[in-house]
Amino acid sequence: MKTLGVLFIAAWFIACTHSFPGAHDEDSKEERKNVDTVLVLPSIERDQMMAATFDFPSLSFEDSDEGSNWNWNTLLRPNFLDGWYQTLQSAISAHMKKVREQMAGILSRIPEQGVVNWNKIPEGANTTSTTKIIDGHVVTINETTYTDGSDDYSTLIRVRVIDVRPQNETILTTVSSEADSDVTTLPTLIGKNETSTQSSRSVESVEDFDNEIPKNQGDVLTA
């Protein structure tokens, strides 16, 4: 340990002695006057690096397109993925731009009044009526189709009304004084006759028979 201490002190003295300026001769001064002065300026990145070592570090992780300034962010985060990220970002931006152009082209072909003109019902109409008997009911299907338009766009409105009625029915119409008609539908039965028969025994005889205790029934007790 003593040897190391002595060596350290000796090295320190040598360094201090070497750091002090020495005496300059007059000849050396004259030679230096004849030599042209060359000014060497440090690069911008070196200045930024030296300034960043003494300034407060920037903790922002946002990417800037102005320039690649050196800061603590570039020191802590490697830049080997920046090229891949910029390529992916540019590809996504180009794809979104293409989609916007396609949507703008599609929307530009739609007329100002819209695809369907709701203020006007098409004049041309095709009406069909179909009647079927299903499970004892008469089913009538009335379908009306309105079509209008051109080769670019067209309007189609289809109205279907389904009417279901019993197969056998009677319609009675009553017209009131106010010219309003009320329709009353009463179902009728065809081919069925209801007949009532009177029982040969009266109610009193049936009740007496129900309350009578049979003589033949009884409990048999055996010892």
From Swiss-Prot:
Key words, A-Z: Allergen, Glycoprotein, Secreted, Signal
Composition-biased stretches (Polar residues): 186-203
Keyword Signal: yes
Principal cellular location given in the protein's record: secreted
Residue numbers spanned by region Disordered: 186-223
Domain of life assignment: Eukaryota
Descriptive protein name: Icarapin
Tissues expressing the protein: Expressed by the venom duct.
The species this protein was found in: Apis mellifera carnica
GO CC entries: extracellular region
Subcellular location: Secreted
Glycosylation sites: N126, N142, N168, N193
Coiled-coil region(s): none
Cleaved signal peptide residues: 1-19
S-S bonds: none
